[in-house]
A protein has these predicted regions:
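PLP-dependent class I/II
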Residues: 1-166
Length: 166
């Protein structure tokens, strides 16, 4: 099962209760949950980000993938990490070492510098995302053939254009 919360492209998030419900299925079918949490710091809705890797009874079946490019406004700078059971990490390393070798130095230095900045603008960035969501909701609410799903986080939203016939 692959989950992206906040989601791209809708901006919707799964709640803690959603994840607890999903836990039942992970246990029932004895499968893995891949949790893409790249937008975890870009949360502005009423739902708090929740990582399923913190659920004790399935943490041995959760692969969390994340990165720094979105939270530090370094989109396009591919640098990330994963947290997973050791056996999974070993297998991923075998695969990854044949796909790419390393992250270039300037990106590593950029992320290092970003970690050193106490307040790097994330609060203001999230506030600006809320302003943009409010603006979009205002614009789309005046369009009878468009509906808008208000996001909880991330940098995306989803507009339903079905009524336009396109």
């Amino acid at each position: 099962v692959i989950v992206n919360s906040p989601n791209n492209p809708t901006g919707k998030m799964l709640s803690k209760n959603d994840f607890l419900e999903l836990t039942k299925r992970i246990e029932k079918f004895n499968c893995y949950l891949i949790s893409d949490e790249i937008y975890e710091k870009l949360v502005f809705g009423s739902i708090t980000h929740y990582s399923p890797g913190s659920i004790d009874n399935i943490k041995d079946r959760v692969i969390t993938i994340n990165g720094y490019s979105k939270a530090f406004a370094m989109t396009g700078w591919r640098i990330g990490f994963l947290a997973a059971p050791e056996i999974v990490v070993r297998k991923i390393i075998k695969l990854q070492q044949h796909i790419n070798t390393n992250t270039v130095t300037f990106i590593q230095k950029g992320v290092y510098k970003a970690f050193k900045i106490k307040e790097y603008g994330l609060t203001r960035f999230n506030e600006s995302l809320v302003e943009k969501v409010d603006y979009m909701m205002n614009v789309f609410s005046k369009q009878p053939k468009l509906s808008f799903l208000s996001p909880d986080g991330g940098i995306f939203s989803f507009v339903n254009i079905k009524s336009t016939g396109l």
